[in-house]
Amino acid sequence: MSELHALLTFPERPISQSYYVPKLQHFLKSGIPATYTLEQVAAFEHEEKNRNGDKEFRESTDDNKTSNTTPLHVLARSLPLDIKDEELQVVMDMMNILFEYGAGWNFIDYEDKTVGDLFLERNQSRESPLYRRLVEAGVSAELLLRKLNGGDVEFLDTDELIGIEPEESVQTAVDGQKEESVGSDDDATAANQQVYLKTELEYKDDALITKENKDGVMMDWETKIMELASETLFPDPEATNSATILNIGFGMGIIDTFIQARKPYRHYICEAHPDVLAKMKMDGWYEKDNVVILEGRWQDTLNNLLDKGEVFFDGIYYDTFSEHYQDILDLYDVVVGLIKPEGVFSFFNGLGADRSLCYDVYKEIVEIDVATYGMKCDYTRYSLDEQLPDWNDVKRSYFNCNYYYHPRITFA
């Protein structure tokens, strides 16, 4: 452990401005990176031992560590449980200094934890100043990254954070709508819609998955979420029979079943995958009097509706597979033209849900993005403690948080 890391274990109490801040500034001004990891310290010590011919040390060292335990991780892990308010302010000042010198907000440490995870373990709530500061740093970093990319949205994939060098600029796509990170040909189905639409699907009792790779397209643990969403889509609960609703992405038909139970005037379903369309025909969705099936990608079918200008919706829901957050931004352009002034837009919110810190960051980014369209996003926080599956029958989980932020987006 370097002197910088040792300082951040808070060896002296109380945590005072006069003791800690000057020392931290000294280390950073002397050239020690704010992203200097414990793993880099260990690698340096390893090389030193090798130069000195310490064979025993060389053989006992694990060269395969790919975590990034940054100074912020050390600070968060060392936070006293009995910390006082005045000490918290000093810690906040230290965090600000680390961020000024380029500290990252979302690296994964040797225990597979983010700084946010560690703050929560040290009795800092999601609304605490330290956790909120971390979220603010994440939002700022992601928006800056988007700006540097010329407007393209490229969120960090937390699966990719393990093994990257903290000093590197990382530009990889993040989980958008039940998508997985791109890392191999096996992942192409989940990351590329054109590949997905040509991929054979399989309906199981409790899930819709890709037949070969076992990617989870939709699972029945989402039922309560879909029930909540279906209620959101009807702005006037006393006039559901006059409502016109659009759902983008049929999947297992969970939300569409809830929508039908409310007997809307018209129920549009946009679906592009041939296997899903075949299932819809087999289950009688094409024969329902108030249902209109839009076969094809929403990018094509909804633009046709927009051009005609004949149909406007009380509620629009979006839940697709293998699309990115950039696709949601593109959808906003269509939504504002198809939704009624008092209408509601919502979507399955899996943005960054493989890590709770990322999930909290993307929650705020959505609020910022919809505001540019003159809209606002209100969230309902829903506990998932007894709902998440064990993921044994799917290749990789697409939702790891024990809570869900349900978005309700309307014109402000």
From Swiss-Prot:
GO terms for cellular component: cytoplasm; nucleus. Its EC number is 2.1.1.-. The modification Phosphoserine is found at S181, S184. It is an enzyme of class 2 (transferase). S-adenosyl-L-methionine binds at Y196, M226, F250, G251, M252, G253, I254, I255, E271, A272, H273, W298, Q299, D319. GO terms for biological process: methylation. Residues 189-412 form the RMT2 domain. Its main location: cytoplasm. Residues 48-65 have a biased composition (Basic and acidic residues). Keywords: Cytoplasm, Methyltransferase, Nucleus, Phosphoprotein, S-adenosyl-L-methionine, Transferase. CDD domains: AdoMet_MTases. It is found in: Cytoplasm; Nucleus. The keyword S-adenosyl-L-methionine applies. InterPro entries: Arginine_N-MeTrfase_2 (IPR017408), RMT2/GAMT_Mtase (IPR051038), RMT2_dom (IPR026480), SAM-dependent_MTases_sf (IPR029063). The keyword Methyltransferase applies. Residues 48-69, 169-189 are annotated as: Disordered. GO terms for molecular function: protein arginine N5-methyltransferase activity. Monomer. Interacts with nucleoporins NUP49, NUP57 and NUP100. S-adenosyl-L-methionine-dependent protein-arginine N-methyltransferase that methylates the delta-nitrogen atom of arginine residues to form N5-methylarginine (type IV) in target proteins. Monomethylates ribosomal protein L12 (RPL12A/RPL12B) at 'Arg-67'. Present with 1600 molecules/cell in log phase SD medium. Belongs to the class I-like SAM-binding methyltransferase superfamily. RMT2 methyltransferase family. This is Protein arginine N-methyltransferase 2. The gene is RMT2.
